[in-house]
Amino acid sequence: MSAPMVGMVVLVVTLGAAVLALSYRLWKLRQGGTAGIMRDIPAVGGHGWRHGVIRYRGEAAAFYRLSSLRLWPDRRLSRRGVEIVARRGPRGDEFDIMTDKIVVLELRDTTQDRRSGYEIALDQGALAAFLSWLESRPSPRTRRRSV
């Protein structure tokens, strides 16, 4: 095979892999979930917000950014490790991407491997879903009794 032919094969294979990855990501996003906007904190002003879809599955909530090509979730929150630190409405230039009906929650992930903070902006329906998921976790004081 000549060098141009090898280059063409590599290009076609690379483009095919990119199309497959994009198709998989779009398929994952279209499977449903709750719309939300999330950012890592600390953040300055209205910067860092990313639109996405939140999927609840058992003990974890997975956040898939709309603009990401990753095959896995961009953020994963453990129900046992998430704490709500503060609750507020949008402020300043956040109104460029949010309405006054949005609620912003400041979250702290206290699991051993993460120890980070997030802000998540949700409308009323998405907020009810998130709080229901979070509040249905077992109490840390409950222990399994042996029979």
Curated annotation (Swiss-Prot):
Disulfide bonds: none annotated. InterPro entries: DUF2550. It is found in: Membrane. The keyword rRNA-binding does not apply. It is a single-pass membrane protein. Pfam families: DUF2550. Keywords: Membrane, Transmembrane, Transmembrane helix. Coiled coil: none annotated. To M.tuberculosis Rv1312. This is Uncharacterized protein ML1147. The lineage of its organism: Bacteria, Bacillati, Actinomycetota, Actinomycetes, Mycobacteriales.
